Amino acid sequence: MEQPDLFGTLAPLPAIIAGVDEAGRGPLAGAVYAAAVILDPDRPVDGLADSKVLKAEQREALAVQIRAQALAWFVASASVQEIDSLNILRATMLAMQRAVAGLAMAPELAMVDGNQAPKLRCAVQTVIKGDALVPAISAASILAKTARDADLLRLHALYPQYGFDQHKGYGTPQHLSLLREHGPCPEHRRSFAPIKAYGAP
C-alpha cells in the first residue's frame, strides 16, 4: 500500500522571515524598544540566544555581528509619553510596527516573541519563548536590549541622581530609594503605579 506523501502536503515556509522582539516593557523609566531582524541563511550568526541570558559584553559583540551580517534589521521605540498615553502594551505593539516597517526589505512572515503581536502588513506568528527558540527572534532581542541599554546610559548622563546606569530603569530597591529622595524625572513613566506613588504630577 502506497504511503501518502505527508511532507508534500505541507505549505512551504515563507522565504523572508523577520524575527521581532521588544525590550523594556517592565521598567519604570525610559522608552520601550523593539527590533526586527531578517537573518541571512548564508551568513549565520553563531552564539545567538535570549538576550537576558547573555552577559552585556556578549550582547554587544553579537549586536555588531547581527548588524553586519543580517539581510535587514531595524530598531525602533515608543517614548515615555506614548507609553503613558497609550498604555505599555499598545506602545510596545507600536514600537514593533515601527521596527518591521523600517526594514530595508519586506518580510513575508514576522515571528514575534510572546503571545501577542501587532497588526502588520505581512503574516504574523507568535512564538512563546521565541527569543530562546528562533534565531531571528534571538537576534531581535539582542538588538532591542543593547539599544535600550545605550539609551539608559544617555538618560544617566542627563539624570545621574537616579542610577540608571546600574538598574536600567527597573524597580530595584536602589531605584525606589532614589525615587523617594528625588521624586520622578521627565523620563519616568507616569502611568506606572510606583511612579504615581512617589508623587508624579
UniProtKB/Swiss-Prot annotation:
It is found in: Cytoplasm. One of its GO terms (cellular component) is ribonuclease H2 complex. Endonuclease that specifically degrades the RNA of RNA-DNA hybrids. HAMAP family: RNase_HII_B. Its main location: cytoplasm. A divalent metal cation binds at D21, E22, D113. Belongs to the RNase HII family. Its cofactor is Mn(2+); Mg(2+). One of its GO terms (biological process) is DNA replication, removal of RNA primer. This is Ribonuclease HII. It is an enzyme of class 3 (hydrolase). It comes from Bordetella pertussis (strain Tohama I / ATCC BAA-589 / NCTC 13251). Keywords: Cytoplasm, Endonuclease, Hydrolase, Manganese, Metal-binding, Nuclease. PANTHER family: RIBONUCLEASE H2 SUBUNIT A, RIBONUCLEASE HII. It catalyses: Endonucleolytic cleavage to 5'-phosphomonoester. InterPro entries: RNase_HII, RNase_HII/HIII, RNase_HII/HIII_dom, RNaseH-like_sf, RNaseH_sf. GO terms for molecular function: manganese ion binding; RNA binding; RNA-DNA hybrid ribonuclease activity. Its EC number is 3.1.26.4. Manganese or magnesium. Binds 1 divalent metal ion per monomer in the absence of substrate. May bind a second metal ion after substrate binding.
